[in-house]
Amino acid sequence: MLKILWTYILFLLFISASARAEKPWYFDAIGLTETTMSLTDKNTPVVVSVVDSGVAFIGGLSDSEFAKFSFTQDGSPFPVKKSEALYIHGTAMASLIASRYGIYGVYPHALISSRRVIPDGVQDSWIRAIESIMSNVFLAPGEEKIINISGGQKGVASASVWTELLSRMGRNNDRLIVAAVGNDGADIRKLSAQQRIWPAAYHPVSSVNKKQDPVIRVAALAQYRKGETPVLHGGGITGSRFGNNWVDIAAPGQNITFLRPDAKTGTGSGTSEATAIVSGVLAAMTSCNPRATATELKRTLLESADKYPSLVDKVTEGRVLNAEKAISMFCKKNYIPVRQGRMSEEL
């Protein structure tokens, strides 16, 4: 039997009691403007799967529920208060993707499918959650095409299972996993296999699997302004992991305000937040063509990224998320709305 390994929680929390209505700093940094968002199709159903600690559909997420599932021993899809960090995490990530007010989500027209895998996940809960998405034949185009994993499973115990799963997902070419690389400031190239975090640890060797790689590995940037040269977020437990050929893209990951399950707000830093922001951009892109292949979406996201020589050793090609370019490039080439009914269910 394979052993469940404890998750890495990839952010630091600073709790705030008041809701914040202003646009977050990173909207300007990555070019997320009203003009950019006008290119998307808000009427096309887009569902992002948040594989995490459960989502509380409150506040700006009140109208964002698509479905909720549990892959935990208690069978509950709701956040539990065993750990403050775990209690908050899933809701926080969902809000960065899709919150409609209070906290501004990157793509507020997206719906969220919550798949709780921690705490107290069943055997290989992360893998089971992804398998359940891949095997769901009732999902329409654009539904759970983007899978946000701002955490993961550490170690080698399930590495072969992960590798088979992700290879199969790549061959299917219809879903993307957006995965956080981790937060201890380590050079991933120097880590042992035991220290790496799945699914970000997936590192295909063959040319076919590389071409079909369904994982987008995300590092976190320190706060910066548009026009400035960004640097990786560092220091403490939230310093971003890095490594050319092990990180696909970097995105804002410091001083990110999110929604908590108690309807208050918090501020966090780390690759968790950066990952959710990338997932939100991909959701916006998907609205323009929900039938697009995973390869098409990933290629556009990476090709449209800004490239900084100062980051080349830490992020492949020095890529930094540019939402304006990614959405514009994809949506001007693709505009095939698919209007489907909304499905909602709970396990």
Curated annotation (Swiss-Prot):
Residues 24-327 form the Peptidase S8 domain. The keyword Oxidoreductase does not apply. The keyword Iron does not apply. Residues 322-347 are annotated as: A2 domain. Residues 1-21 form the signal peptide. The active site is at D52, H89, S272. Changing S272A: Reduces cytotoxicity on Vero cells by more than 99.9%, no toxic effect on mice when injected as purified SubAB5. Does not cleave host BiP/HSPA5 in Vero cells nor purified BiP/HSPA5, does not induce the unfolded protein response in mice. Disulfide bonds join C288-C331. SUPFAM superfamilies: Subtilisin-like. Disruption phenotype: No longer toxic to CHO cells when deletion construct is coexpressed with subB. GO terms for cellular component: extracellular region; host cell cytosol; host cell endoplasmic reticulum lumen. It is found in: Secreted; Host cytoplasm, Host cytosol; Host endoplasmic reticulum lumen. Forms a complex with SubB with the stoichiometry SubA1:SubB5 (called SubAB5). The catalytic charge relay system lies at the bottom of a deep cleft which probably accounts for its substrate specificity. The C-terminal A2 domain (approximately residues 322-347) penetrates into the central pore of the SubB pentamer, making different contacts with each SubB subunit. This is Subtilase cytotoxin subunit A. The lineage of its organism: Bacteria, Pseudomonadati, Pseudomonadota, Gammaproteobacteria, Enterobacterales.
